């Protein structure tokens, strides 16, 4: 089972998503795909930045995100995940907080993180997959 990183979800929003990503997704059951609430928050933050420049575009992306949240398994940042996040962050002041939260979610739920940014997650001890390199 897989936890999609923010960059993978963003890729799917592109007019022409990368072929390798689409091919990989075709081989995975929807029931095996999960999102972290952190990813939803990161996308929403991008929407808010866009809203200041182009309200119509922001509304379009927000409607897409609403549909994603309604149709995908979104895993919360609960007590178990926050405790794992604290373990991952301990002694790593240069670690990106959001990446550590996504990794903690994956560790607690036994998921593989699907990301283009493998290097960002290597120190967290979670299984990783880069669908851009699966062609």
Regions found by a protein language model. Give the residues of each.
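Short, well-structured N-terminal submotif of metal-dependent ribonuclease cores
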Residues: 1-35, 49-63, 135
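Residues that scaffold the ATP/ADP-binding catalytic core of kinase and kinase-like folds
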Residues: 11-12, 24, 46, 84-85, ...
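Short secondary-structure boundary/capping segments
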Residues: 24-27, 65-66, 73, 103-105, ...
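A generic structural signal for short hydrophobic patches within well-formed alpha-helices
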Residues: 9, 40-43, 82, 121
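Acidic active-site catalytic centers that drive phospho-/nucleotidyl reactions
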Residues: 5, 42, 99, 117-120
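Short loop->beta-strand "edge-of-pocket" segments that line small-molecule binding or catalytic clefts
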Residues: 2, 29-34, 68-75, 112
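Acidic, PIN/NYN-like endoribonuclease modules and their adjacent C-terminal/linker elements
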Residues: 1, 103, 108-135
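Active-site neighborhoods of divalent-metal-dependent phosphate/nucleic-acid chemistry enzymes
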Residues: 45-48, 53, 59, 71-116
